[in-house]
Amino acid sequence: MELTTRTIAARKHIALVSHDHCKKSLLAWVMENRDLLAQHELYATGTTGNLVQKATGIDVHCLLSGPMGGDQEVGALISEKKIDILIFFWDPLNAVPHDPDVKALLRLATVWNIPVATNRSTADFLIGSTLFSSEVTIAIPDYDRYMQQRLDLK
């Protein structure tokens, strides 16, 4: 697939997602990084978002709960280029009924080349990067060209 570029603004749109067994860890991480995260636009699946808002007072765009379609909502926002970073503390040791949604979410984050943190260490590396609060240009699929080629029936 051909690539193009996308510029991500210094003020990021960050999605926060966590499995039930990881919510305490994500909340602790958010609390430790509250001041920096408050400078960005936060989105989250339902339960996670409400817990973050309650614990920090930061406004969060709360989507549906993950198992009720929230993971897919986040994936759609990624595809629409409305999410710049995904912080997803997931539990690799416990299966969840919506595992296919989880795989799809991680796949879309990879397709659209956005940074993903899946645990505290990667989240620390990501938020500690000078790029976290800087404008940055990333390579993404050239969807317009992709559609043009698919519609060219010659």
Swiss-Prot record:
Function description: Catalyzes the formation of methylglyoxal from dihydroxyacetone phosphate.
Superkingdom, natural source: Bacteria
Protein name: Methylglyoxal synthase
Annotated binding of substrate, by residue: H19, K23, T45, G46, T47, T48, S65, G66, H98
Active site as annotated: D71
Record organism: Yersinia pestis
Enzyme class: lyase
Positions of the MGS-like domain: 1-154
EC annotation from Swiss-Prot or TrEMBL: 4.2.3.3
UniProt GO cellular component terms: cytosol
Assigned protein family: Belongs to the methylglyoxal synthase family.
